[in-house]
Amino acid sequence: MKPNYPLQLLCETFEVSRSGYYAQQTRLRCPGPRRQRDAELLELLQTEFAASDRTYGSPRLHRALHARQEPVSRKRVARLMRRVGLRGCSPVRRRVITTDSRHEQPIAPNLLAERSRPIRPNQVWVADITYVSTAEGWLYLAGIKDLYSRALVGWAMSEHIDTPLVQAAWRHARDHRRPQAGLLFHSDRGVQYASAAFRHDLEAAGAVQSMSRRGNCYDNAMMESGWASLKIECVYRHRFRTRAEARAAIFTYLHFYNRRRRHSALGYLSPVDFENQTN
């Protein structure tokens, strides 16, 4: 819109020189190289942010741009994100205890602490059960993670937290990955993992069972961190009306987690890319 007052009067009122006004108009019409580059980067950032289902913060978006061969500093990425209001998911502390270790079943020794870091897939798996709230009630999710690549190699969901749930997750992982005998399978001391039926499944596959020490959550920290990502980036962003809704959202997220989500511990590669790179 053109001003209704003489330019000279406006410049004097706002204490701006005529040359400064014209210089600003030129900059707006012809943005310099830095502004042009910011515009290009913003378009790429918004594309990558949408591809992550609006979960990535500046560290992962920074690595995503580098993967596109776009040199840019992390500070610049953070600045541009603030400019347009892009915000990744932030941690939320919530916890419900799912482990029932008050049982008479045998407890396996903690062999994980004695093992060196795995050097290839299917040497060490860790397992745990988590929960998801829906309007219909709890949905329980049993998962198994490969300690080498952080890939979730097996999972199962049910409205019941019982031995068949962890057996289903085990069968999913076993049939998909075909581990050799000697696989170390680590979990907490929950009755589901200590049950005779589940111990039989492991023995039949030649897997060696390991369990955390009593009351020590750090023994299974790798699995806990995976659940934290699921809760923050998927579960807490929804209000599930049904268990079926929750199942669908979780299934989609777990495939994203394995195939596309960048992990800082893997050099910001996804678990699938990390395994493909090292095989």
Per-segment meaning from a language model:
Residues 1-279:
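Charged DNA-binding/catalytic regions of mobile-element recombinases
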